[in-house]
């Protein structure tokens, strides 16, 4: 999404280290943090700065495990994100993503219809306070005890003054070849960055 962000007028900085979170003053000046970091650890100072920046109004956006399976031991981080990955029954499977009819006018999903995916169908533990925009329903084929469970796929929320956007799609970059998936993430990033408000 970096080239697209540049086209939108954002100055983009890419970092391969969580040490980017050590400079709190710099963090506080960005519009949005897009984190892609899975199954790792974060130091107390890195986490404290990230939480403070978002709480103070910096946007946070991400997808798949890069945001919802980053730091399994950090519950305040999970509270900020709004959920934590726990399983993807069946691995790579075919499933449908359903845009909630009552959210059809939300700018992140407006004009989009339900769509098919061939990827991991995330089962998450989610905060009941999130604003769900799209869901998926588990068939029960790979875990019979969850047949019919409706799971959030796309949500937004606030953490302090910061906007947080999450999408569970995106196991591989090719998942974003699905136009609806790509559009949802683009719009979600802009919402988190408050770009439409400026």
Where are the regions that the model predicts?
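Extracytoplasmic/secreted proteins, especially bacterial periplasmic and envelope-associated proteins
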Residues: 29, 45, 49, 76, ...
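Helical hinge/lid and interdomain linker segments adjacent to catalytic or ligand-binding clefts
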Residues: 1-69
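Extracellular ligand-binding/catalytic regions of CAZymes and related secreted enzymes
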Residues: 7, 140-151, 158-198
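Catalytic beta-strand/loop cores that center a nucleophilic Ser/Cys/Thr
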Residues: 6, 29, 86, 91-160
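Structural detector of well-ordered beta-strand residues that form the stable sheet scaffold
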Residues: 59-61, 133, 165
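A glycine-rich, often tryptophan-bearing local segment used as a flexible ligand/cofactor-contacting loop or short
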Residues: 40-111
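Conserved beta-strand segments of alpha/beta enzyme cores
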Residues: 11-13, 131, 163
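Oxidoreductase and adenylate-handling cofactor-binding alpha/beta cores
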Residues: 77-84, 115-116, 123-130, 170, ...
């Amino acid at each position: 999404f970096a080239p697209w962000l540049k086209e939108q007028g954002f100055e983009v900085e890419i970092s391969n280290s969580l040490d980017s979170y050590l400079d709190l003053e710099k963090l506080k000046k960005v519009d949005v943090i897009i984190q892609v970091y899975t199954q790792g650890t974060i130091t107390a100072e890195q986490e404290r700065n990230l939480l403070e920046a978002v709480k103070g109004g910096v946007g946070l956006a991400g997808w798949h495990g890069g945001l919802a399976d980053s730091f399994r031991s950090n519950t305040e981080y999970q509270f900020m994100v709004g959920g934590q990955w726990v399983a993807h029954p069946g691995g790579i499977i075919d499933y449908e993503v359903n845009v909630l009819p009552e959210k059809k006018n939300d700018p992140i999903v407006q004009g989009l219809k339900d769509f098919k995916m061939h990827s991991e169908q995330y089962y998450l533990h989610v905060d009941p306070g999130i604003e769900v925009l799209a869901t998926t329903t588990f068939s029960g084929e790979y875990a019979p005890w969850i047949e019919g469970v409706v799971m959030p796929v796309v949500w937004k929320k606030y953490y302090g003054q910061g906007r947080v956007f999450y999408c569970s799609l995106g196991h591989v970059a090719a998942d974003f070849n699905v136009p609806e998936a790509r559009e949802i993430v683009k719009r979600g990033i802009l919402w988190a960055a408050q770009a439409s408000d400026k």
